[in-house]
Amino acid sequence: MDAPYRIRSAVPADAAPLVAIERRCFSDPWSETSFREALDSPWSFGLVANTGQGIAGYLIAREVAGTGEVLNLAVSPDFRRRGVARALLRAGLVYLRKRRVEEVFLEVRESNRSAQALYLSSGFRPVGQRAAYYRNPKEDALVLWLALEQHA
């Protein structure tokens, strides 16, 4: 890998660089306020992959009553295909397992084949669909699920 990275907890002060990545990755990006609220919430957490050049990617997830949900995962186009997304996802699942979470859900755009490949290869399985879940452009979401006790 060209630029080594380390995974660390995200803090509200990371919101601006996360928005910059978000805008490069998604057509309907989260706002800085959305990131700050997620990172300030007692039910959610964030992880970032930090390089010598700044933040390469992030994961935002939450846990409620034994169920986890990956809310957002993105890697800057400059750092893709280097294992950053997989490392963030793996670290997020470890964190959720330590919190005694038993299952994890996420939504992914039907057209986002690379993200689907990551999630499926990490043990997630399709369990449903949400019609017109995404805006700009309007698109259905696949709902994926992972049983953490089976994913060690």
Tell what function each PLM region has.
Residues 5, 9-80, 86-99, 128, ...:
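Acetyl-CoA-dependent GNAT
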Residues 1-2:
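Short, conserved catalytic or adaptor-binding loops enriched in Gly and charged residues
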Residues 33, 64, 107, 120, ...:
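Conserved catalytic-core motifs of GNAT/GCN5-like acyltransferases
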Residues 88, 112-115:
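Conserved short alpha-helix immediately C-terminal to the canonical SAM/SAH-binding motif I
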Residues 20, 117, 121:
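DNA-binding alpha-helical recognition surfaces that contact promoter or target DNA
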Residues 102, 109-113, 132-152:
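C-terminal "cap" of GNAT-fold acetyltransferases
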